[in-house]
Amino acid sequence: MKHIDQVISQALILCEPQSKDSMKLHKIAQQVTDMIDKSITTIDDDRILGLSVGGSYAKGTWLTEDNDIDFFVKINPNVNKREFEQLGTRIGLSALRKYRPYLRYSDHPYVEAKIQKVRINIVPCYQVNRGQWKSAADRSPFHTIFMTENLDEKMKGQVRILKRFLKSIGIYGSQLSVGGFSGYVTEILILRYRSFVEAISLVANMNRDKQLIALNEPDPQYLPSFNSSIIIIDPIDPRRNLGAAISAESLGKFILAARSLIQSPSIGYFKSTENKFDIRVLEKVKPNLLIVEFKIRKRSPDVIWGQLKRSLTALSKQLSISGFNAFGSTCITDENEYAAFVFLVEFTTLPSFTLNVGPEIFRMRDTETFIEKKMHKLTPFWINGNMRVVTIAERNNLSAKEYLSELLSGNVSNVGINKDIIEDLRTGFDVYRGTERKLNRFIKSALSRLILNDGRIIKYQRD
């Protein structure tokens, strides 16, 4: 077995951008800067105060296989939100018009396009003093300045290794579709612990107590409002907890993967792997999988993921209330026209009757009311050991598949499903169990989010 330091040396070589890649990125950055400057000159609006380059490119922590360049158009802070968004969108669409730009949405719209497979984001922000934030993007130029002043070349290499590791295990990125660790968070982790090995050692040994990570002494007045499993204080904004975007599942996966790497160092942890299931595990869960597939109308990926996740939570709750007990669920979309919900249920069919426990026998009126409501159905009554009146109730739905089909075909506006998802479902949907057909690549990808089946982390014994 290789020593972990040997593996990290290999990973560093793997992550280091080649000179041709750096030259390509620098050329594109200059090209886009010129295009934005030209658009700003053409628009000639004195509310536009400047332009800055940000993100991993500006900080020197980008990955060759996943690079983007962020441009922040600085707007006068006196501009209202509607005009702020209009100005940012106008500049972005104008500057990137030759590259089929499109709108993306975070806290406000921004423009994205791809040039030679490099993702370009043009984002409006207010030109404000530190701490006087008016939009979520206002912090970004300060993040760039902070990291360029504090990260040395050695630490930049360590950041790349950490990014590559997180990307390999599927938890890199703070967007809703991932719920993982952002590039900025990886930079903070390396600044705090100085190396990749020290950072993952901390993670591998996390306990039940909330883990607090801060570069400066945290302000005690804000700590009570942070309730995530891991608290990561933004060094330029003590009121902001970067850990809030990290899901419990992503943190748990990070902990397991960190332990596995420390115990069995291998360069394989830094190489992306397709979501391939151990077929034995897949066969075990198939009978208890319940899948809903449907078409979606085109809208922002950030919006659709949020709608899907909220609707997934609502449907999982309904399945559990009805006795099928969804103890695992996930969703998937191609962000264009296809979406699916996947549920891992305890029961796919239920008995004809369920127990209905009534009031204590000493509560006279409640007991009489309970019996009167039930007796017309000719159901038996008895007194249990807790001296409560008990009867049985006939279930309307014995099949999880039929129950979900009926639920989605009816009025679901009052169960918490997003209204846009309801409209999508109205055009048609398909409900099936995992054993009823061959699972497509989207469903397999969804299952890789739901079930830990990465052979580097869960090492199943071969027969």
Q: Would you name each region that the model predicts?
A:
Residues 14-22, 73-77, 294-301:
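Glycine- and acidic
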Residues 54-92, 119-131, 337-351:
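Catalytic metal-binding acidic patch
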Residues 154, 159-336, 345-356:
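Conserved nucleotidyltransferase catalytic core and NTase-mimicking acidic/glycine-rich helix/loop elements
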Residues 36, 40, 86-133, 319, ...:
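Conserved catalytic core of two-metal-ion nucleotidyltransferases
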Residues 21-24, 28, 32, 80-88, ...:
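Short amphipathic alpha-helical segments
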Residues 1-64, 81-82, 110-112, 125-127, ...:
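N-terminal regions immediately upstream of nucleotidyltransferase
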Residues 334-463:
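Extended, charged low-complexity segments
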Residues 114-170, 174, 194, 198:
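Internal, well-ordered alpha/beta segment that forms a basic, Gly-enriched binding/recognition surface
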